[in-house]
Regions:
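Active-site/ligand-binding-proximal alpha/beta "capping" segment
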Residues: 192-242, 246
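A glycine-rich helix N-cap at a beta->alpha junction
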Residues: 64-89, 172
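Boundary-proximal intrinsically disordered activation/regulatory segments immediately upstream
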Residues: 1-67, 150-151
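RNA substrate-binding interface of SAM-dependent RNA methyltransferases
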Residues: 4, 42, 68, 77, ...
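Structured adenosyl-cofactor binding patch, chiefly the S-adenosyl-L-methionine
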Residues: 98, 135-139, 153-166, 224-264
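Structural motif
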Residues: 52-57, 101, 121-122
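Amphipathic alpha-helical repeat scaffolds
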Residues: 33, 124-132, 243-250
Length: 264
């Protein structure tokens, strides 16, 4: 028997989804769209509940996802398009939203072998943070530390930017930046800070060792104490009148330089 179509925004299921939309944090994340739900499932995330419009079930990809969820015994509620739009963060609902448990990662997993780490400080823009995590995973990073002032990696915009990397790339949130650098130094990890005033160019430092790349936001960058605490400070040379790069772009440059050196 088909599930009844939810038409009221006061329905208990709708209120449950809306509560997470309006209050980020906690143990659950709100996922939007077929692709992101697929990525979460593939990463082994626990999807606890799904809401979908009838339109999603008529599309081949949406139908396949709903069948996969049914096999996993994940509760699926059908919602009228207007009702589903009320729990969606997107301007245009993609027809599927889900609740999933946020993964919990262990630091030892990040440090287990040949660490290539990222330390992000004050990355407030969720889209930039998501893109940064995506670049880190693509370059083969073993983990990331998200220090003071960073956006929630499981907010809608961050998840859209990372496209599932937040579920796969081990990371720790709300860590102290200075304490993290000290702890990494004690573990034999070289910390390399990105700054326009770096004493060497990014491709002149040895990134084949256990290393953590430290980046701040585009506006403020890293504070002097953090820069002083790092093992090395590197700059990305730029031409023309360009003074800085988007932090995810800068991270990508450094991460893929590390990947290049490690392939030699």
């Amino acid at each position: 028997m088909a599930a009844p179509l939810i038409r009221s925004r006061s329905n208990a299921v709708v209120r449950r989804f809306r509560a997470l939309k309006e209050r980020s944090g906690g143990d659950l994340a709100l996922l939007e769209g077929t692709k992101l739900v697929e990525e979460a499932l593939a990463a082994g995330a626990t999807v606890t509940e799904v809401a979908a419009s009838p339109r999603a079930g008529r599309m081949p990809r949406g139908r396949a996802l709903l069948e996969a969820l049914d096999k996993r015994h994940v509760p699926v509620s059908l919602m009228h398009e207007d009702v589903l739009a009320s729990v969606s963060e997107a301007e245009t609902s993609q027809g599927v939203v889900a609740l999933a448990r946020r993964p919990v990662f262990a630091e030892e997993t990040m440090l287990a072998r040949d660490p290539l780490l990222l330390v992000a400080v004050g990355i407030q823009n969720p889209g930039n943070l998501g893109a940064l995590l995506r670049a880190a995973e693509a370059a083969g990073a073993t983990g990331a530390y998200l220090a003071e002032g960073c956006a929630d990696p499981f907010s809608w915009k961050a998840l859209r930017g990372s496209m599932g990397s937040a579920f796969r790339l081990p990371h720790l949130r709300r860590v102290g930046a200075r304490e993290t650098l000290k702890r990494l130094d004690a573990r034999g990890v070289v910390t390399v800070a990105a700054t326009s005033s770096g004493e060497m160019q990014y491709d002149q430092v040895d990134l084949t060792r256990p290393v953590a790349l430290v980046l701040g936001n585009e506006g403020a960058g890293l504070d002097p104490e953090l820069l002083a605490a790092a093992s090395a400070r590197v700059a990305i040379p730029m031409r023309g009148g360009v003074e800085s790069l988007n932090v995810a772009v800068a991270a990508g440059v450094l991460l893929f330089e590390a990947a290049r050196q490690r392939r030699r």
